[in-house]
Amino acid sequence: MTKWKKLSHTIYQCKYHMFGIKELLSDETADKVWEVTNKHLKRKEMLPQSILKKIGAKIIFTTDDPADDLVYHKMANNIEGITFLPTFRPDAYCNLFDDNWKSNVEKICQLTGQNITLKGLVEALRMRHSYFAERGAKASDHGLLEPYGLKISQKRAEEIFQQAYNEGEKFSFRSIEIKEFISYMMHKFCEMNQEKGMVTQIHYGALRNANEYLFKNWGTDVGGDISADSVNIIENLQPLLSRFFSGENSNQSHLILYPMNQIFAHTNLMLERAFPNVHSGFPWWHNDSPYMMEQYLLHTAGSSLLASSGGPVCDGRKILSEGSRFEVFDRIICKTVGKLVSSGQMTYSGGVKAVKALMYENQVRIFNLEGESAIN
């Protein structure tokens, strides 16, 4: 149980809220914590559906591969009072640096009956995008090192596809070819989202698998990811923003930018001011603690309009975290706005409006959820 040793030094160990456990998780208490939590998890009220109903979940977005048949969403939507909606996540078909990229392209082209070409890949993804939209999808989600959006010609994109697929050339994740290819695909995805009235979400700034030893020996998602310290935002995004989120197109679709690190949040807030349908989302890893949530809200209030923020996403892989993360966020909103009101920096009515917008109204408006039966 030595893997729990470091956890004894962490703060925010809130196991007692769910399981009544007051001891810190450590080498000495790990076995007891394991036994007690498993005992609690066997109770009927700790079943997934019971937890979701207890926390008042109405609509839950999942993140799904475009090739997913979404059969479990249909089954889950038989749960009274909760709607599960898929989210289109096409990273696997854009990341030329990934060892599985070629097989992923073959999979989705075969699934949709398309030729294995750039044109075939785009059409295959368009077909699956429509499939998702027909089943209630409200957004696409894209995990990028940088928010790529350069204007790239089809000819250039085809050259890169040819190099990667037919010639087997390997590109590093920071290569110009990666930037150009993903930029081309992001324009295609924004086209699709605009046609279907879906939101484009970009999570950027995560440097994956920085610890090569961990990656080679244990694979991905084992603690070797870090925050990138250099991200080009404006130069990369400006062509995409000008095409889809300005002028006559400014009210047709929404873009939410979630930076990995709060150091990039100020740029997002400036973009939010310049482009009406671009929203600054919470820096997701940076804001997993109450302290950093409060700092970000104050930064937003001082740099942009607090009430227009895109708010946080849970990004939780565990059902028990769904309610707790949003409860912490809601409490921090009330605490932060309350301080602004009590110090005379906001009116009481303005504070109430900001809290309602951040907790609920912005999500309903941006993701076009007014017609969903679960919230009516």
Per-region residue spans from a language model:
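Histidine-centered catalytic micro-motifs
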Residues: 199-208
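Metal-cofactor-binding active-site regions of metalloenzymes
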Residues: 1-196, 248-253, 257-262, 269-376
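Histidine-centered active-site/metal-ligand motif
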Residues: 142, 203, 239
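Active-site-proximal binding-pocket segments
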Residues: 209-283
